[in-house]
Amino acid sequence: MAVKFIDGSSKLFIVREYATMRDGQTLVKISDREGKCIWVSADCLEVLEG
């Protein structure tokens, strides 16, 4: 699944995995084209078609 940040950035990321925390927040592990991965809050991402 492809996603991008909701701040208007055009850079695309691929979702690798996700986790729901005890407080209900969802974290998503995303990677860029170089394969670098980071965990971010799902609230700051927009899902793209695909």
Specify the residue positions occupied by each region the protein language model found.
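Basic/aromatic-rich interaction segments and small domains that mediate binding to polyanionic partners
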Residues: 2-44
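Short hydrophobic/aromatic patches at helix-to-coil boundaries
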Residues: 46-50
